[in-house]
Amino acid sequence: MNFGVQTFTIRKAQKKDIYKSYLPLIEMGISELEIARIDFNEKNADEIWAISGNHNIRPVSIQVKPKYVFGDVDGVVRFCEITGCKNVVISMLPFSCILGSEEKFYSFVDSLDKQYEIYDKKGITLAYHHHNWEYIRLSNGKTRMAELLSKTKKIKFVHDTYWTARSGISPDAQIREFGNRLLGIHLRDLAFKKKFLDVVPHDTVIGDGVIDFKAVLDAAQEVGCEYTVIEQKTDTPYEDIKRSLNHLMKINSRSKE
């Protein structure tokens, strides 16, 4: 299994210089990226395409805010055409759904398969990336995640191990529930730290937390997941990516024995 990087992890360096921010990843042997936290314009697309042409690294997906996925289809598609990327990921549930009425949520759910078809006609697969808001229960007792799955048929999903585990759900169980609708996985570990009188969850280097990543990778292979990317909110991104990558490679090598 190949392990890429979600560029939210290196967002500060990427904002300063895309090319220089990718070089340490290339040196680590990273060959796949899910690109996030940049302007999806032609200038950046041209730069990423040039990097891909000179190095063994490519975008497997781009994570885009809902307002652009729905409101600027031509711009998003153009970015994908230039970079050779075939997957677009809706970054999150719109704030109108998180804070608004259930009617707004169900309206968004109803729009997903329709938007999937629009991108599919352009040769692009559309997926949805979740956080922990999707595990909140609605007035009918079902979670938003359950409704997202049951009321759509085409939209793919990108799973986030951290947000699932933080919500008290087993990541490998959620992966199997997604089944063949799982497109990719954000690999993030979960740890806890004391803050005053509270115990606060946070993401951490893979292997330093509580998530069973062997179970995650086994489930990912079982359902035919297309890509996996390391993601973490950290002040030392390259060091932490390297440590996470080493841990995942050890798990991967043991699985082949």
Predicted regions and their residues:
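Active-site beta-loop-alpha junctions enriched in small/polar residues
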Residues: 6-10, 36-38, 64-67, 93-95, ...
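Conserved, mostly hydrophobic/aromatic
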Residues: 5, 25, 33, 52, ...
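Active-site acidic/histidine proton-transfer and metal-coordination neighborhood
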Residues: 23, 31-32, 46, 55-58, ...
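Glycine-rich, proline-tolerant flexible connector loops at the mouths of alpha/beta enzymes
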Residues: 33-53
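Short, acidic/polar
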Residues: 12-25, 44, 70-80, 167-175, ...
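Hydrophobic faces of well-ordered beta-strands that scaffold small-molecule active sites
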Residues: 3-7, 33-35, 59-64, 88-90, ...
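Acidic/histidine-rich catalytic cores of soluble enzymes
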Residues: 119-210
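Boundary/entry segment of secreted carbohydrate-active catalytic domains
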Residues: 1-16
